[in-house]
Regions:
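Bacterial N-terminal signal peptides that target proteins for export
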Residues: 1-8
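Bacterial N-terminal signal peptides
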Residues: 8-17
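A general "mature secreted/periplasmic domain" signal
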Residues: 21-132
Length: 132
């Protein structure tokens, strides 16, 4: 019985470790409004964006960082526009969940974008100035 319990705990701990590998790291919400988010760039990190019909989400990169290119898996479901170090997106299709890749002159950013409710929408995601 004791040996079985130890094996079960060992297997469970290994399974738990595997589950966290693909976990999204959530950006930090503003102390004033949870729809305004801040984060640091981390290579290989996927950043979640929750957008809402009729609302624009702004992604702001470090000052001086220039957007070179972008693409998504379901681009017809979204409106995209890049200006300076800002990137704007707005859903056109309520079922338009996809990934988004934005390449700047400094980094490649990976996003998981989903349309959803206004209450959970990301109005703004700002990347703080951090060098890697």
């Amino acid at each position: 019985m004791r040996k079985s319990l130890c094996c079960l705990l060992l297997v469970t701990s290994f399974l738990g470790c595997g589950l966290s590998v693909n976990a999204l790291e959530r950006p930090t919400a503003s102390q004033y409004d949870a729809r305004v988010m801040y984060t640091d760039y981390k290579p290989g990190q996927v950043y979640p964006i929750r957008a809402a019909n009729g609302l624009i989400t702004t992604i702001t990169f470090s000052p001086g960082e220039k957007i070179r290119d972008f693409g998504s898996g379901y681009s017809t479901a979204w409106e995209f526009q890049a200006r300076g170090n800002n990137f704007f997106l707005k859903p056109k299709d309520f079922d338009g969940a996809t990934n988004l890749v934005i390449v700047t002159d400094k980094h490649t950013y990976l996003f998981d974008v989903h349309p959803g409710s206004r209450a959970k929408a990301t109005y703004s995601l700002t990347f703080r100035s951090v060098s890697y």
